[in-house]
């Protein structure tokens, strides 16, 4: 009887024991899984942090690109160069007022009157009364390097006292094309150290620089001949001040015993270590002007003329005026650039100007 009861109770006991063991195993398994879950949570947190960092980096890069874009836009939005930004200096002397200078006043200076300054050694009531900017210097009328440097010093000081961005120098036997000048200067950075012109030599200038104790040393440098014209940016002109402002320009000229245009090249290349930019758009009477083709003439910044071996050295252009009427060819050039000028032939007034041809 007892044995029979035992057989009835034993299965229930075994089943209960099995349930307890199973529960214990499940609890142990969950306990073992907790660190792994915590590790997974850490991984998720790390991933979220890394993702956030990546997003922040991406956003930062985007903001940097945006800022750079704005900076580029600001650079690109610099107002375009205008004729009013250029200080055009013409060097002359009293004995050429009625000849060389009169031709310039009649032609290209009539188009740039407000921005052109005439540096001379003699007062001229007739020219001043017509509203031209005449600067009468205290310089000698002689064609010596001291007298020439005296006038260049005046040009430099007057430019530095202005608000203008460029100083462009020409002589009284140059024709200046304002449109070509603007096209040239606009190709340069607004804040650059620019010295552009044309050398009269095919090699650097060689000179003797005077040193203390009556010693000298050989120096060589490129310079833009004043007879073809040249331009200086304001940034560069400001850097030239220790050797060019006030009486210093003439003092520097005396150190190398050379005229004004050589002195400019000496200051820029030797004192500042900046190279001159050579341009074939400037022309002096020292070159063969007949080699310029008519189609290229409207693209040139300056032209010139002069006598060479009893022959007139000027550009070759047919029509408008004869060579006897216009030996320099400046009037012919001017009428082709500005056909509506009052004294130009009537036949030209309905034609496209050279300027319009070039722009189109």
UniProtKB/Swiss-Prot annotation:
Its cofactor is Mn(2+). The active site is at 261. Glycans are attached at residue 214. Residues 1-5 are cytoplasmic. GO terms for molecular function: metal ion binding; O-fucosylpeptide 3-beta-N-acetylglucosaminyltransferase activity. Keywords: Developmental protein, Disulfide bond, Glycoprotein, Glycosyltransferase, Golgi apparatus, Manganese, Membrane, Metal-binding, Signal-anchor, Transferase, Transmembrane, Transmembrane helix. One of its GO terms (cellular component) is Golgi membrane. Mn(2+) binds at residues 173, 285. Residues 55-74 have a biased composition (Basic and acidic residues). It catalyses: 3-O-(alpha-L-fucosyl)-L-threonyl-[EGF-like domain protein] + UDP-N-acetyl-alpha-D-glucosamine = 3-O-(N-acetyl-beta-D-glucosaminyl-(1->3)-alpha-L-fucosyl)-L-threonyl-[EGF-like domain protein] + UDP + H(+); 3-O-(alpha-L-fucosyl)-L-seryl-[EGF-like domain protein] + UDP-N-acetyl-alpha-D-glucosamine = 3-O-(N-acetyl-beta-D-glucosaminyl-(1->3)-alpha-L-fucosyl)-L-seryl-[EGF-like domain protein] + UDP + H(+). Substrate binds at residues 100, 172. The chain crosses the membrane at residues 6-26. PANTHER family: FRINGE-RELATED. This is Beta-1,3-N-acetylglucosaminyltransferase manic fringe.
